[in-house]
Amino acid sequence: MGQIFSRSASPIPRPPRGLAAHHWLNFLQAAYRLEPGPSSYDFHQLKKFLKIALETPVWICPINYSLLASLLPKGYPGRVNEILHILIQTQAQIPSRPAPPPPSSSTHDPPDSDPQIPPPYVEPTAPQVLPVMHPHGAPPNHRPWQMKDLQAIKQEVSQAAPGSPQFMQTIRLAVQQFDPTAKDLQDLLQYLCSSLVASLHHQQLDSLISEAETRGITGYNPLAGPLRVQANNPQQQGLRREYQQLWLAAFAALPGSAKDPSWASILQGLEEPYHAFVERLNIALDNGLPEGTPKDPILRSLAYSNANKECQKLLQARGHTNSPLGDMLRACQAWTPKDKTKVLVVQPKKPPPNQPCFRCGKAGHWSRDCTQPRPPPGPCPLCQDPTHWKRDCPRLKPTIPEPEPEEDALLLDLPADIPHPKNSIGGEV
């Protein structure tokens, strides 16, 4: 089945292209709950299956793990089926909030078939993130941070704001794997966040710890010191888990970014598929919105207002300007750049002319289709011959010397006049 996956090598494996980070972290948390632990082969098969499943993104908006499990082929290799089973069980255990009843009106109710009136919005029942859960009965798995672990975590949250779903899911996954103490969490906070964010987090954490100590925690002994000190003991696994939950909850009170949100300026390109545009919006909202902020109303509003004109016309024609996101995706599913075929204007061919060609004098073809070379416009400027161009003039060609007669060739072999030697005294010999 492959070698057991080493958790110290990379705490957060890379997600497949096109899948939001918080969805991928849910799959990772479910995979780490397997007993025995997942292998690298399991992660490879999980990525391979998710790439195939992303071709039908209906199960994402909202996410439905039962529908995703129905797309899994029978006998699929790896432990993908077990991972999906854990996600389905976790999704069923978390109670969903009931949808608010529609407001009753004393007057007549509008008909359901009116396309101008959007249907009432129903809150998604699927959880956006999974809580930190450890295998039941597992021994303490505390491991101090290493610099490569901190660098890998910081790289994952570099594009996410503190308190956003992607930031929180990454931190939850790191807490689940390393089971850090209070001192480890303080080091992680100082490494990831600025001094201002760390100060605000520290104030909120102190208030949460005071409330928890007043309320009472299982295993907490006031005579043994504050909760922060007792959570540093690796043997106090229960108190350490309580402190981890309080430390994560302190991020909920952090203020958002003061600058204009980047997701408000995301527009759909003229040739961009609609589902790719919605996925970009979804990822940007995950990175920018603080945890607990309802994302779906903002996503549905931007999915219509920031779409291109053609997709807006499709949504208006089908009455899905404020519908659930799945209906909007299905409405624009048929519109893709591949379907926009170019209309070519084909001119009918003219019949061959009956008149003779201007070049060769034969009938049955046009002069532009004639195979004869084009005649020169006038006589050659060198030799005044009207039958050829200047580039073909014989005067421009190099002249070949004529062969000499045979007698002259024989004379060339004879020596030339030999100079007579002179005496040293003077005079010829």
Curated annotation (Swiss-Prot):
Motif segment (PPXY motif): 118-121
Pfam families registered for this protein in UniProt: Gag_p19, Gag_p24, Gag_p24_C, zf-CCHC
InterPro entries named in the record: D_retro_matrix, Gag_p24_C, Primate_lentivir_Gag_pol-like, Retrov_capsid_C, Retrov_capsid_N, Retrovr_matrix, Znf_CCHC, Znf_CCHC_sf
Residue numbers carrying Phosphoserine: 105
Gene3D superfamilies for this protein: 1.10.1200.30, Delta-retroviral matrix, Human Immunodeficiency Virus Type 1 Capsid Protein, Zinc finger, CCHC-type
One BP annotation, GO: viral translational frameshifting
ZnF endpoints (CCHC-type): 355-372, 378-395
GO cellular component, one term: viral nucleocapsid
Residue segments, region Disordered: 93-142
SUPFAM superfamilies listed in its UniProt record: Retroviral matrix proteins, Retrovirus capsid dimerization domain-like, Retrovirus capsid protein, N-terminal core domain, Retrovirus zinc finger-like domains
Membrane spanning residue stretches: none
Note: HTLV-1 lineages are divided in four clades, A (Cosmopolitan), B (Central African group), C (Melanesian group) and D (New Central African group).
Protein name: Gag polyprotein
Organism: Human T-cell leukemia virus 1 (isolate Caribbea HS-35 subtype A) (HTLV-1)
